[in-house]
Amino acid sequence: RIEKASSIKYPTMYVEPSILISGSTNSLDVGILYARTIPLIVHDSIHVVIQISAPLVAYGLKGTIHAILAHEFLHYLELVTRLSKTELLSDEISSNLFENVYSDNTRLLEPRSVFNDNMLISHITKKFPSGFRDYKLEDKVIKFWIEQKLPVSKISLDTNTVKLNAIQLSNIKLDELLLQQLEIIKTKNSKLRKKRLY
């Protein structure tokens, strides 16, 4: 559905057989990560993959799954844009969940600039007004996954990073068609953001 709505191939993805819990080591601020976009280093080259948690697949409603996968797709496009311009090193990571949600919302492309599927856009905007929250899904994950002692991976928000050296950055091979599509999307995105400001 996401490929059809964007005319762009979805990146490699895999299902992680655990739930990822993120938070700050010095705070009660904790969040469940149902999916995340990860740049992996393979043979001194960078490949971007989407990691999906098993509980999302097991307990998420179809619209929720589509919204999360579309949101991660926006992260993928943002990351590819930054990789193509080698702007990757300047990103700041906060250990505060609220600051990360704000940063997430200001960096990503407008869904309407990427997707031509109104239902998918509606799912994204309703599920991610300011960070993702689905209380029914959270309750199911806590009750049927975490409390059942199924695998849980804990990470600190400020360690959810990948360090790249100059060789890895120079070995990046990006799809030319994707870069052309991103240029069109960025133009649409800029127009949408200007409209929203006025």
Predicted segments with their positions:
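Post-HExxH zinc-binding segment in Zn-dependent metallohydrolases
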Residues: 81, 85-127
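Polar/charged side chains located within well-ordered beta-strands of beta-rich proteins
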Residues: 1-3, 37, 51, 78, ...
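Propeptide-to-catalytic entry region of secreted or membrane-anchored zinc metalloproteases
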Residues: 10-24
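Zn2+-dependent metallopeptidase catalytic core
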Residues: 1-11
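Short, conserved micro-motifs enriched in small and acidic residues
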Residues: 63-64, 68, 89
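Active-site scaffold of zinc-dependent metalloenzymes
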Residues: 26-63
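Active-site recognition of the HExxH zinc-binding catalytic motif
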Residues: 67-80
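Pan-zinc metallopeptidase signature
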Residues: 114, 118-198
